[in-house]
Amino acid sequence: DHDHGARWQPLSDAVASGACVSLHNDGSVSPPTPLLNVQTAATRRTRSGAVHDPEQRITLDQALRAHTINAARTLGRDHLVGSIAVGKLADFVGLSDDPYCVDPGELAQTISVLGTWLGGQRINLGTFLAAAGAQDPAPHQHLNETAHARHCC
């Protein structure tokens, strides 16, 4: 309901309090949609189009940091991941556009992931899924097709 949605993730209050705000997906119950998470945090607009408690929006920069360096800090791994710096693991994604040059309300619809790097090495999606033990790759085939259509991997 609307009242529950309005109280959902009071991110602005958390940032104002000095908390290390992080965003993530729980793979077992939600799809891995970091760009949509960032978009929602910056706009408070849900998939249905409703805007819940707009005063709890955070800036695009705060939302991006919440999904990168702050998430790594929450896990105690910010010395290894969460940002690109000498001595870190070089785990990152390449995006089709600069998120700071796109309307935050259109982030997930405008920007796509062009590739993923782990330890500085570009990952081939098919190889990764096979190595991860995907029993039936059919549910993931659209990812590979999208990757090839966008000259990825």
Predicted regions and their residues:
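Phosphate/diphosphate-binding loops
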Residues: 1-22
